[in-house]
Every structure is written in structure tokens, then in C-alpha cells.
Amino acid sequence: MQASLIAFMISLVLSALLFPWLIIWMRSHDEGQQIRDEGPKWHEKKSGTPTMGGTVFVLSAAVATVAICAYKGQLSKTVWILLVALLGYGIIGFLDDGLKLFFKRNLGLRAWQKMDLQLLVAAGIVLLAASDNFDFALYLPFAGVVKNVVLFTLFEVFWLVGFSNAVNLSDGLDGLATGLSFIAYGTYAWLAFKSQNFGVLVFCMAVMGGLAAFFMFNHKPAKIFMGDAGSLALGGGLAAVSIFLGRPWSLLLVGIVFVCETASVILQVASFKTTGKRIFKMTPIHHHFEMLGWSEWKVDLVFWLVGLVGSGIYLMIWG
């Protein structure tokens, strides 16, 4: 546990030192987030806020994880796979953010380009897992444990791509995705500690350290956004952690807010295409509550509480 706390501190200190520099650099070069037209009108005042903060906490977490695991002689293939998930999806987000900044509009990679890259990273993770004699066993409700490489591969790809996008959808308010991710990684850190999975524990704690530093600059009013470089990386990392702890379904509760955010978008699109009517005032659902008059802080606090409750329920029943 002491080593994981050191990983937390290394990541926190590195991030805390680098964020001010990144903010100053972006402001001096007039680089900042362009707010999408279809979002709430009052978000337009956030236009120009520095972004790509995810690059800092992702790299800091990776450095801390490698340093501590290497020092302890526990730099296993599982740790490398988790880093591939974090860095792989982070690079996709970095490319997306870079295009947004270059063209000065809130568009980046085309949807098909982003999806192809996400599938490519997921496929790479599956191949790495296969080379490590990973147990391709998947528990299915009402069917029990099923050992089928093809089925597990499809599930793993869906899980990685799905949750990387789910966290991305949740990153729409100051501090929201940061707090939710901190809670989720904290839950998995505890599960890894209980199961004595050193590599996963260090990885989760390192990510938490970076997020703790980032929150100092991302709470309302945000001085910097994480961008897709952060949100895609966090989601991919969470999915990978849940899989390599042998608890993939846990993410439905631990990441319940991410699931609800994604479901709200799917339901909204399906309803509008089939009936011409919208279920929510705006999606993802955090914007719906904004449209009802909730402040950003109220949405943050309520959603964080839901995330805590979801994680708490999982830990009480299955932890």
C-alpha cells in the first residue's frame, strides 16, 4: 500500500507542476476550447479555456506507474496492457483535441476515424492479453461462466470502446468527469488492494493522483479542460481495469453515471428518429438538469453522490 501511495504522490506532484505551465502556454498562444453550438448558450463564455489537460495527468500517471512497478520488480504484462489502454485512448484524444485547436472549431476527428482508432487500440489490447495466457472467461447472467475466446474478445472490444466514449460524454461540466473518474478509480484501487493485485493498485492510485492535481485547476470555474485526451484515456483505463480484475460487470455500478449519460444520448436519438420527439431537454443528461435550472455545482454534487452510491452498493454486495 505504501508503494501505491508514493505512486499517487509522484503523479500528483508532476501534474501539479505541469498544469500551470500548460495553462500559461496555451493562453500565450491563444489556444483554447471552442464550445459547440448545440450546447447550452451560457457555456459560450467558456470558449477559449485551455484544454488538453488530460495529456498531463495521463503522462504523469504512466510515469508514476512505471517507476514504482519497475522499482518493486512488478512491471508485469498486465501493467503494460493497462498503460496501453490509458495511453492508446489518450493519443486518440490528443489527435482529436489537436485538430479542434488547429481548426479553431469544436470538431476534431471524424466519427468513423475516431471509432476505427478506438477499435484498433482495443484489438491491440486483446492481442496482448492473448499473448499473456489471459483467462478468456466471461460470466453471463443466467448462463454462468462461459469460456469462449470469440465471445470474450467481442465483449472486451465493446467494453473498451463503449466506456472510453461514455466518460467522454460525461465530460461536459467543470469537474464532473474528474470527480466521477476519481471515485471509480478509487473503488478499483480498493478492490485491487483486497485482491493483492499490486500492478492494478499502483496504476489506479497513479491515475487518482493525477486527477487530484487536475481538479485543483478544473473545478468551477475551470482554468483548463481535460479534453478528449483525458476523457477517452480515463474511460479506456477503467474498462481495462475492470476486465483485468475479473470484474467487468462491476463497471455498470461503479460507472453508473457514465452508463446513464450514454443511455440518455441513445434514448434521445432513438426517440427523435422514431417519433420526432425528444425525451430530455438536452443530452447528455447533465445538460438536461442544467436546462431545468440546476447550477453546475449542483449537477456535479448530485452526480458524484450517485457515483459514490453506485460504488458503495457494489462494494457492499460484491466487494
Curated annotation (Swiss-Prot):
Its EC number is 2.7.8.13. It is found in: Cell membrane. GO terms for cellular component: plasma membrane. Its cofactor is Mg(2+). InterPro entries: Glycosyl_transferase_4, PNAcMuramoyl-5peptid_Trfase, PNAcMuramoyl-5peptid_Trfase_CS. Keywords: Cell cycle, Cell division, Cell membrane, Cell shape, Cell wall biogenesis/degradation, Magnesium, Membrane, Metal-binding, Peptidoglycan synthesis, Transferase, Transmembrane, Transmembrane helix. This is Phospho-N-acetylmuramoyl-pentapeptide-transferase. Belongs to the glycosyltransferase 4 family. MraY subfamily. The chain crosses the membrane at residues 5-25, 51-71, 79-99, 119-139, 149-169, 173-193, 197-217, 224-246, 299-319. PROSITE patterns: MRAY_2 (PS01348). Pathway: Cell wall biogenesis; peptidoglycan biosynthesis. Its main location: membrane. It is a multi-pass membrane protein. One of its GO terms (biological process) is regulation of cell shape. Signal peptide: none annotated. It catalyses: UDP-N-acetyl-alpha-D-muramoyl-L-alanyl-gamma-D-glutamyl-L-lysyl-D-alanyl-D-alanine + di-trans,octa-cis-undecaprenyl phosphate = Mur2Ac(oyl-L-Ala-gamma-D-Glu-L-Lys-D-Ala-D-Ala)-di-trans,octa-cis-undecaprenyl diphosphate + UMP. One of its GO terms (molecular function) is metal ion binding. The keyword Cell division applies. Pfam families: Glycos_transf_4, MraY_sig1. It is an enzyme of class 2 (transferase). Catalyzes the initial step of the lipid cycle reactions in the biosynthesis of the cell wall peptidoglycan: transfers peptidoglycan precursor phospho-MurNAc-pentapeptide from UDP-MurNAc-pentapeptide onto the lipid carrier undecaprenyl phosphate, yielding undecaprenyl-pyrophosphoryl-MurNAc-pentapeptide, known as lipid I. It comes from Lactobacillus delbrueckii subsp. bulgaricus (strain ATCC 11842 / DSM 20081 / BCRC 10696 / JCM 1002 / NBRC 13953 / NCIMB 11778 / NCTC 12712 / WDCM 00102 / Lb 14). The keyword Metal-binding applies.
